[in-house]
């Protein structure tokens, strides 16, 4: 079985080699797992009433901030603070999720290059670490996710609670994670409360107003052009099966997306595109002209969000422990078309098996859980505004916890028991030894090129082959075309602008096996 390494891992290595002193913005907060101390001082009387009054309008309030991390203590006057969240706002105490904007009132104010921080209140999570563990595993497996950590938060000298700190997806994130921040960044709409505007990637027409309730542009707002996203949805929904299969890798970073989908499925994280069709970002990388997928909001991972309704223990819907690898809600065309393609679904299973072998298992995840538990235990005990008891916190590390009805009620899966049960089911459903590995697929066979001679377009077809490098050279040996396709067995190349003459096609696969063919262009 293969082991893939995300580009980010290589990027971090080369950055470290070329400049050992270089730091990524936000390292002080996120590089090492730690518990920050956040002390906010509001000068308004009845400040929390004002925060609640501003919730629906997302209006900030001024507060002074003292932030302590592993590198020291830092003071910031007049940061912006506002409450946030959808279901998390139903937390029965005043421990609401919130956001800090360093730059809201003091232009240019940042902490270690970071302009905004999000604070999740661990709603519906007795373990107090679901989101952190989920993001840790996703990041290690090569998927784009925000960085996260923990914090003890004080409002006007009073301990308000223990929170999970989550990085903002903005141009700072794009700078370090993707190395490109010129493109359009879209956030999937909330679709909260059954508004019937899911960010489902269904094509509703060519007019931007058809999508403004579904996707929010977060960069290049002055230009406010959604054409690129609409074009992508047009491609997903209206391409022929053959064109979708052959061109998807040209449209998005497919390897990372397939891994992202696999992780949502394994963790039964269905408050995502797979289920609710929200809680994700899409970024159009201008350096590669490909879309990149970024996860968001993992607080209901480990099966806390029902799959198709009622998916918890004893629920009437799908049992989230026994969800098949190709599960998705209806009207999710990107997933539907991927799973309908033999080659793309095979590519998905390759990524799925790699993650199952190397990341989604008790041997890998249990030590992460134990480490976080030992770090946060005393802080969780000190949080008098948490939804659950200290015993619930201790027990939910390994066992299910049940509570009453209402927001956050019901049965919440234990972290370790969920992983163990889910892995046991998946290993019975997928025989990863039967999934052809990269090594078995290296050899290109039955290469076809037609028509020959050609005038406007050539079609290439082949069998097998992974890690392909396709080059076309003219009669003088000048490179006129190069591509590195993944997970496909055919490719169309437009040649209508090429000069008439003889050309040489060279196919090289990852094991060094090469095949070549000569063709001509006549008009």
Question: What positions do the PLM features span?
Answer:
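Bacterial Sec-dependent N-terminal signal peptides
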Residues: 1-24, 438, 523
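Conserved oxyanion/phosphate-binding beta-strand-loop segments in alpha/beta enzyme cores
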Residues: 63-121
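Short, well-structured beta-strand/strand-turn elements
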Residues: 141-152, 272
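C-terminal outer-membrane/trafficking sorting elements
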Residues: 18-21, 441-450, 454-523
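A conserved alpha-helical element in kinase catalytic cores
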Residues: 123-143
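Middle-to-C-terminal accessory/interaction subdomains
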Residues: 24-29, 33-36, 46, 55, ...
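Short beta-strand/loop motifs in extracellular/secreted proteins, especially
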Residues: 61-63, 96-98, 149, 466-470
């Amino acid at each position: 079985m293969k082991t893939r390494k995300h580009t980010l891992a290589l990027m971090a290595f080369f950055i470290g080699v070329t400049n050992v002193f270089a730091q990524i913005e936000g390292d002080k907060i996120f590089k090492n797992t730690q518990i920050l101390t956040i002390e906010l001082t509001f000068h308004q009387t009845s400040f929390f009433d004002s925060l609640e009054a501003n919730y629906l309008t997302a209006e900030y309030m001024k507060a002074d901030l003292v932030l302590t991390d592993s590198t020291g203590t830092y003071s910031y006057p007049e940061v912006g603070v506002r409450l946030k969240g959808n279901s998390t706002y139903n937390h029965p105490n005043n421990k609401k999720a919130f956001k800090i904007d360093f730059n809201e009132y003091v232009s240019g104010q940042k902490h270690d290059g970071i302009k905004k921080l999000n604070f999740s209140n661990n709603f519906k999570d007795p373990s107090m670490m679901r989101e952190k563990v989920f993001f840790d595993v996703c990041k290690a497996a090569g998927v784009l996710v925000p960085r996260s950590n923990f914090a003890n938060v004080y409002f006007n000298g009073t301990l308000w609670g223990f929170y999970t700190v989550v990085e903002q997806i903005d141009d700072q994130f794009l700078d370090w994670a993707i190395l490109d921040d010129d493109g359009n960044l879209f956030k999937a709409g909330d679709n909260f409360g059954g508004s019937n505007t899911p960010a489902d990637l269904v094509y509703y027409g060519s007019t931007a107003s058809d999508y403004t309730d579904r996707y929010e542009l977060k960069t290049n707002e002055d230009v406010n052009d959604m054409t690129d996203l609409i074009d992508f949805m047009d491609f997903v929904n209206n391409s022929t099966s053959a064109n979708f299969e052959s061109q998807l890798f040209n449209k998005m970073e497919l390897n990372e997306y397939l891994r992202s989908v696999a992780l949502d499925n394994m963790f039964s994280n269905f408050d995502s595109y797979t289920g609710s069709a929200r809680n994700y970002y899409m970024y159009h990388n201008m350096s590669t002209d490909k879309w990149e997928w970024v996860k968001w909001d993992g607080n209901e991972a480990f099966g806390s969000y029902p799959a198709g309704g009622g998916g918890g223990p004893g629920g009437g819907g799908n049992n989230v422990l026994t969800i098949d690898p190709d599960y998705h809600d209806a009207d999710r065309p990107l997933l539907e078309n991927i799973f309908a393609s033999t080659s793309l679904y095979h590519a998905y299973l390759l990524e799925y098996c790699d993650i199952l072998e190397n990341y989604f298992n008790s041997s890998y995840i249990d030590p992460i859980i134990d480490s976080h538990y030992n770090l946060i235990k005393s802080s969780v005990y000190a949080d008098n505004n948490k939804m659950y008891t200290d015993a619930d916190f201790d027990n939910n590390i390994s066992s299910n916890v049940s509570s009453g009805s209402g927001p956050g009620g019901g049965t919440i899966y234990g972290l370790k028991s969920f992983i163990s049960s889910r892995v046991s089911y998946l290993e019975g459903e997928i025989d990863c030894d039967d999934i052809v590995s990269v090594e078995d697929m290296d050899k290109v066979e039955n290469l076809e090129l037609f028509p020959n001679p050609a005038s406007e377009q050539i079609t290439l077809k082949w069998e097998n082959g992974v890690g392909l490098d396709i080059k076309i050279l003219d009669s003088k040996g000048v490179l006129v075309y190069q591509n590195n396709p993944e997970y496909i067995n055919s490719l169309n190349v437009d040649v209508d602008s090429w000069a008439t003459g003889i050309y040489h096609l060279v196919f090289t696969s990852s094991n060094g096996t090469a095949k070549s063919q000569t063709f001509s262009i006549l008009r």
